[in-house]
Design a protein with these regions (language model features):
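Active-site phosphate/ATP/adenylate-binding loop shared across adenylate-forming ligases
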Residues: 1-9
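Walker A/P-loop phosphate-binding motif and the immediately C-terminal alpha-helix
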Residues: 2, 16, 38
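Acidic, Mg2+-coordinating active-site environments of NTP-dependent enzymes
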Residues: 7-8, 37-177
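Inter-motif core of Ras-like GTPase G domains
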Residues: 27-40
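Switch II (G3) loop of P-loop NTPases
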Residues: 10-22
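Short, well-ordered alpha-helical microsegments
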Residues: 21-24, 79-80
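Hydrophobic positions in the central parallel beta-sheet of the AAA+
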Residues: 13-15, 35, 70
Length: 177
């Protein structure tokens, strides 16, 4: 599909790369401009995936070695090890610690036709963001998306509009009764 995307004029793509995909060498030969490490926990441990957490972390970190810029969640408890395994430039984001990009003044918002959160991006980038899906993990996800968007010089109003109108079918849909 990559060749078809190029033929049809696609300049950028976002791709989820799993630890299993890395372990099975599915992305060998691909150098990524940006790689994002959101978090890691004891998922994917078992006979069909990874033998133990150390193996899982090892393979997750392999993605960042393939990236020009590694975007890493500063709040993840394995941050130091992740950064030791990162490739070239490391950019950090956080809700709780000093980082290149930080989410501050986080508020949960409940309005007619909107349930979500509002926060300020501070650090290397200044922006007020409203995201229409609640939950702390969505602050992390939205902040990580802002980090990537900042590298592409996208207009801030487009970033804000996209996050405020984000829609995933079946996720936090408002049902009027």
């Amino acid at each position: 599909y990559f060749a078809q995307m190029v033929e049809e004029g696609c300049e950028y793509m976002v791709m989820e790369v799993s630890s299993q995909g890395l372990k099975m060498h599915r992305v060998d030969g691909i150098d990524f401009d940006y790689g994002m490490f959101t978090n890691i926990s004891n998922d994917h441990i078992g006979p069909n995936e990874h033998a133990d957490f150390a193996e899982y972390l090892y393979w997750k970190c392999q993605l960042l070695k393939k990236c020009r810029v590694a975007i890493v969640n500063r709040d993840d408890e394995h941050f130091e090890e992740i950064c030791r395994n990162a490739g070239r430039e490391v950019v950090t984001y956080s809700l709780e610690q000093d980082a290149n990009f930080m989410a501050k003044d986080i508020h949960y918002v409940s309005e007619p036709d909107f349930v979500g959160l509002d926060f300020d991006v501070t650090g290397q980038y200044q922006l007020n963001v409203k995201v229409n899906i609640p939950g702390k993990f969505n602050v992390y996800n939205a902040l990580a998306a802002v980090v990537v968007c900042s590298y592409f010089d996208l207009p801030k109003d487009r970033i804000c509009h996209a996050l405020e109108h984000l829609y995933v079918n079946g996720r936090m849909e408002i049902v009027h009764t």
